[in-house]
């Protein structure tokens, strides 16, 4: 007994089972996908499936198919696949199910792309910074309550939204530059489309402002708004904007955004909205703003050293292009060493013994480690300079750990 599954060709076919012969008419039409004829014979529990796959071009092809009971021939068939299968139960066609491993692989790739898009070295630092800036408002151990934890989570959500908006807008405005300086970024490499990055960036802004509004914290709302406006002024290429072209405006943008706005905003959110205390500006807050301002200047200047090639091509006159990478490198190192020296002197005046010891000893260690790395850095290697830039971010993170301990 013969079982025949007709192929999905447009037109009629004459099928003869008694004579063990199937003849198909000639077709002279344009096809843009491969078609196949499947003939199944059931004999002693065995199924023989024969596929004749035809790749049709945009030219007219005449194809003749002749399918016999014992075999299959094709006069003008470019590819032929024969599959022998043995089955004793069912001869019905069953669609292939999706491989869960492939689905998980796609999800994993998407998460990895988003992870790279967010620049993990920076997002870790900003979240840690927001955490320790929130701790500045803690006056006693009893302040570390559930209310503090909820307020801290609110700050973390806000700062992540700010960060994603910042990096997203930067990549949107610097696509061509990043293809030279940072070709591994998702947008520059093509792993993320321009449209998707626009959606992610706009969503982070809306989510940040909406979240702060729902929480009912005006310090948090204005922190998100002002930080995003500084990010736009720094990146967007419009009249009076695109501050990254000018070293002084770049430094001002980083100080105002990272040091002043975030330090004050997160502290006031915890102080007034979480702890319900009057607005004050304690000594740790002033120290936090001052030391983070130095780091903001150093990061703003140093980040352009590995990016000189792309900046020069697109007319961005960074300080590294004006003074040279070596001079800017040692300016950044000197600024950090001076900041550590001043911090050691100020920390020594603390009336609290444990705060005095931690502040002096901690910054002395940071200063020593920085000097050791600076002396062994090859200033002619762009890879080494990029590595040193990552090292500055690590120092920045370590500084955040010391800030709440300054009293």
Curated annotation (Swiss-Prot):
Intracellular or extracellular location(s): Plastid, Chloroplast membrane
Catalytic activity: (2S)-naringenin + dimethylallyl diphosphate = sophoraflavanone B + diphosphate
Membrane topology of this protein: Multi-pass membrane protein
Membrane-traversing stretches: 117-137, 145-165, 206-226, 248-268, 285-305, 328-348, 352-372, 383-403
EC number: 2.5.1.70
Cofactors demanded by this protein: Mg(2+); Mn(2+)
Transit peptide, residue positions per record: 1-23
InterPro entries: AtHST-like, UbiA_prenyltransferase, UbiA_sf
GO cellular component: chloroplast; chloroplast membrane
Swiss-Prot/TrEMBL keywords: Chloroplast, Membrane, Plastid, Transferase, Transit peptide, Transmembrane, Transmembrane helix
Pfam family, one: UbiA
GO molecular function, one term: prenyltransferase activity
Family (UniProt): Belongs to the UbiA prenyltransferase family.
Function: Involved in the biosynthesis of sophoraflavanone G (SFG). Can use flavanones (naringenin, liquiritigenin and hesperetin) as substrates, but not flavonols or isoflavones. Shows a strict specificity for dimethylallyl diphosphate.
Name of this protein: Naringenin 8-dimethylallyltransferase 2, chloroplastic
Species of the source: Sophora flavescens
Gene that encodes it: N8DT-2
């Amino acid at each position: 007994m013969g079982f025949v599954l007709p192929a999905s060709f447009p037109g009629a076919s004459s099928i003869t089972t008694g004579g063990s012969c199937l003849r198909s008419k000639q077709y002279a039409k344009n096809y843009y996908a491969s078609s196949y004829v499947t003939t199944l014979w059931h004999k002693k529990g065995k199924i023989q499936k024969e596929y004749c796959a035809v790749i049709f071009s945009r030219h007219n092809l005449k194809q003749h198919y002749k399918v016999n009971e014992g075999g299959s021939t094709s006069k003008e068939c470019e590819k032929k696949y024969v599959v022998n299968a043995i089955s004793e139960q069912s001869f019905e066609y069953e669609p292939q199910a999706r491989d869960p491993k492939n689905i998980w692989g796609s999800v994993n790739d998407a998460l990895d792309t988003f992870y790279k898009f967010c620049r993990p070295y920076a997002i870790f630092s900003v979240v840690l910074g927001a955490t320790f800036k929130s701790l500045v408002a803690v006056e006693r151990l009893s302040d570390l309550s559930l209310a503090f934890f909820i307020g801290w989570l609110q700050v973390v959500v806000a700062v992540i939204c700010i960060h994603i908006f910042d990096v997203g807008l930067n990549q949107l405005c610097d696509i061509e530059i990043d293809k030279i300086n940072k070709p591994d970024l998702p947008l520059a490499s093509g792993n993320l489309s321009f449209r998707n990055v626009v959606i992610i960036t706009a969503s982070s802004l809306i989510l940040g402002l909406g979240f702060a509004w729902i929480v009912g914290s005006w310090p948090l709302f204005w922190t998100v708004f002002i930080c995003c406006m500084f990010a736009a002024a720094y990146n967007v290429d419009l009249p009076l904007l695109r501050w990254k072209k000018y070293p002084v405006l770049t430094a001002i943008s980083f100080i105002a955004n990272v040091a002043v706005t975030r330090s004050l905003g997160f502290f006031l959110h915890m102080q007034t909205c979480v702890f319900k205390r009057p607005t004050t500006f304690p000594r740790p807050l002033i120290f936090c703003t001052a030391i983070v301002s130095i780091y903001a200047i150093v990061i703003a200047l140093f980040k352009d050293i590995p990016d000189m090639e792309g900046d020069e091509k697109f007319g961005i006159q960074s300080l590294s292009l004006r003074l040279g990478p070596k001079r800017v490198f040692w300016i950044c190192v000197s600024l950090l060493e001076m900041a550590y020296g001043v911090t050691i002197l100020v920390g020594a005046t603390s009336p609290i013994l444990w705060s005095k010891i931690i502040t002096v000893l901690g910054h002395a260690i940071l200063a020593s480690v920085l000097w050791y790395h600076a002396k062994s850095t090859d200033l002619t290697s762009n890879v080494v300079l990029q590595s040193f830039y990552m090292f500055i971010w690590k120092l920045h993170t370590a500084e955040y750990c010391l800030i709440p301990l300054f009293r």
